[in-house]
Amino acid sequence: MENLNSYFDLFDQSRTSEQAFEELVGLFSDDIVFVLNGHEKQGIENWKLFVKMVFKENADIKHMFEGWKAVEGTDKFETPWAVCGKRASGSVFTQTGKDIAKLDENGKISYLENVPGDTNMFDTYKN
């Protein structure tokens, strides 16, 4: 659970800190499965590409989350989140949604699903 609790802060810090980026990557298993608005990707290298894409498209971002809770009857955890940011174009945005995660036997994040309120949020990362 410690890795889940560190995730959002490290994600935001990773935009300007290579050390935070390495710590962020260390939260995940090498074979991470992540789902962005219904589009599944696999592997830590694809995860790193996604994070870099977010930072290329956004000049600044800040996440808030309510707290990870176990999903009854499953091995998953979830939390509602909100993010505000400034795109590279200069426009500002807000977004809400939820993340669903699983941890492996070592406590690393092995599955992460991002379910944004805006279904177009990750259109640029479908391919």
Model-derived features: where do they sit?
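Short, mixed-charge, low-aromatic patches
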Residues: M1-F11, V35-G38, V54-A59, P80-W81, ...
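A generic structural signal for ordered secondary structure
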Residues: N5, I32, K48, Q95-G97
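A solvent-exposed, acidic/Ser-Thr-rich amphipathic alpha-helical stretch
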Residues: F21-V25, S29-D75
